[in-house]
């Protein structure tokens, strides 16, 4: 992956490499059943994002109970029960990470786990999660001017080209997200790099559909593993 960056953007800073080590992978695997449950019931979970955010900001706890859905978090202890299916686990990362996970990070981990199978099959290589990269030349940073960073939700290679994916579990309202996805993909991967918008919902408004088409972004909203593999194979031809 660093080969792409050194070739196309040699002066850009890599703040977070996005390499998932064995310990981090274990944590993702521990949460896999929860990520699967959240995806299965995403229509009910996603509208709760704002309430979850507000609750956590107020007391660093989450306590929601309605319509056969219970969600509890306090002091790293997690309990989610949806229609009688209950998952309990201890979230041992830093305190704010579970909030990030439950309001969208779970979908990134869900897609990451899907792509692990393509990694095993050697359809893709060098899979990364949550890379953070400088979008300015480090030489331009002077005095108190702070660098601007871009986060790549998921990045991988097919052995030849860079692929960057933006994962959206909630409604996409800002066209700027698509512009940033396209721009950053080209900066770090060159003209042949591919960008993918991965969404939990197939409903894109007219304006966003046009933007996706103009920017040549592949939109995938179901059968993620299969559709990503097909996209890679078609791109190789």
Explain the meaning of each model-derived region:
Residues 1-237:
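Intrinsically disordered, low-complexity Ser/Thr/Pro/Gly-rich regulatory segments
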């Amino acid at each position: 992956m660093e080969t792409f960056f050194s070739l196309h953007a040699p002066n850009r800073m890599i703040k977070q490499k996005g390499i998932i080590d064995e310990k981090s992978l274990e944590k993702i695997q521990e949460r896999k059943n929860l990520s699967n449950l959240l995806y299965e019931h995403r229509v009910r979970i996603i509208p709760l994002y704002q309430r979850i955010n507000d609750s956590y900001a107020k007391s660093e706890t989450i306590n929601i109970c309605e319509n056969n859905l219970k969600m509890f978090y306090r002091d790293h202890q997690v309990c989610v029960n949806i229609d009688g299916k209950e998952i309990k686990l201890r979230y041992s990362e830093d305190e704010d990470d579970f909030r990030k996970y439950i309001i969208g990070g779970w979908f990134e981990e869900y897609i990451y786990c899907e792509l692990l199978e393509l990694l095993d099959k050697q359809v893709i290589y060098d899979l990364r999660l949550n890379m953070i990269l400088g979008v300015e030349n480090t030489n331009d940073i002077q005095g108190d001017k702070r660098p601007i960073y871009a986060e790549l939700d998921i990045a991988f290679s097919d052995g030849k080209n860079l692929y960057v994916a933006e994962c959206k579990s909630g409604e996409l309202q800002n066209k700027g997200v698509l512009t940033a996805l396209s721009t950053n993909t080209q900066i770090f991967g060159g003209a042949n790099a591919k960008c993918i918008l991965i969404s939990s919902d197939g409903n894109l408004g007219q304006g966003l559909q046009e933007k996706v088409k103009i920017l040549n972004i592949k939109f995938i909203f179901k059968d993620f593993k299969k559709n990503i593999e097909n996209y890679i194979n078609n791109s190789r031809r």
